[in-house]
Amino acid sequence: MDRYRVIAKFAKQNNWKQGLELGVWVGVTTFYMMRETDVKMYCVDSWEEQPDNPEYDWQFNKKPRWKDGKLTVEEFTNKNQAWDHNKNEEHFRDNAKQWGDRITIIKGRSLAIIDQIPDNSMDFIFHDSDHSYPFVKNEIEAYLPKLKSGGYSM
């Protein structure tokens, strides 16, 4: 089962109202959550190059797209298309408009914008930003105060 389906299932089962996604890329998880739940999402991404990130060169070969209410994929012809940050940000922002105030976009790196997220405010946090173990470990620890009691960090 895809991770976005699992998160949506948890959201429904636990009656989650508010979530945070750190690293949205083009918004696959966010837009699935919009379609399948009533959750309000805070979405954080820098949409910038990360030459200091060893996972940055990760080879994506599929580009998610929503068409007629369904998730589809288009093949990338090269990895540079996956990392066209301006187009990915534009794609995300354009698709986010239809969801109004259910999506709050915060541009920046997750640890740099942490003070913009209120403590004890999130039912769940989905960590999908850097993908390196040391960074994700630090990010999880830093964001724990943002979770409501009983909230999930994944």
Predicted regions and their residues:
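S-adenosylmethionine/decaboxylated-SAM
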Residues: D2-M154
